Amino acid sequence: MRQKHVREIRLGLIVARIWRRHTRSGLRHSVAVRRLFRNGDVWKESSRFGRDDLPLLRLVIDRAHTWILLQKRRP
């Protein structure tokens, strides 16, 4: 069974999904960023971004980073 992400941050069609895993050295987070698009009636995802996606991409990544930092500060 695939593990579900613990947080999803979305701005427009840019989405970041954050996963949490426990390792020997402690808690680790990883982030996958995708751009959503429609191909006819079907929604798909891409890991490629155009020039106009970059401002939103920067904001989504910053929010993901902030969320991860806040998790590390919680007891």
PLM feature segments, named:
Residues 1-75:
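Single-stranded nucleic acid-binding surfaces, predominantly the OB-fold ssDNA-binding core
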